[in-house]
């Protein structure tokens, strides 16, 4: 949303004077892509390779759970080292309280990270129950679609891939899940 806000404010409204027409067109096209991700719309699908190099499809993964949390993180990010395990603990509690099964599609959103650093992060924080770990690498279309230019980020989808929450937090996840229950009654 922050990236979209900047494009809207400075490019779309004409405040930016140093970019040429072609550069502005590219950014406006990106804005259109970002704005396609609306709550209750089908999420932009992601197919990325896991730690063993096998492609993992987000929507197919999501079908195995009541809900799936899409997690963008960087193993070297200090904030991620706190927030990702905190979200994992929150999910464990919510699964018991709400009697739901929540999958975690965790995306390593780091440009220059070694496979060992990536796997060490997963193991050190015990991020293994109902997880698929994939790496984003330099995939800009996915990064743009999810406005994943900061870490960590959390998105919530249902088993059909409907986007229920964007950029949520461990604090707000319970509210988002209860809201999803009420919407489908």
What spans do the regions from the language model cover?
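Oxidative protein folding and maturation machinery
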Residues: 1-56
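Short, small/polar residue-rich loop motifs at catalytic or cofactor-binding pockets
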Residues: 42, 66, 149-151
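Structural microenvironment flanking redox-active thiols in thiol-disulfide oxidoreductases
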Residues: 82-124, 138-143
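Thiol/disulfide oxidoreductase modules built on the thioredoxin-like
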Residues: 137-179
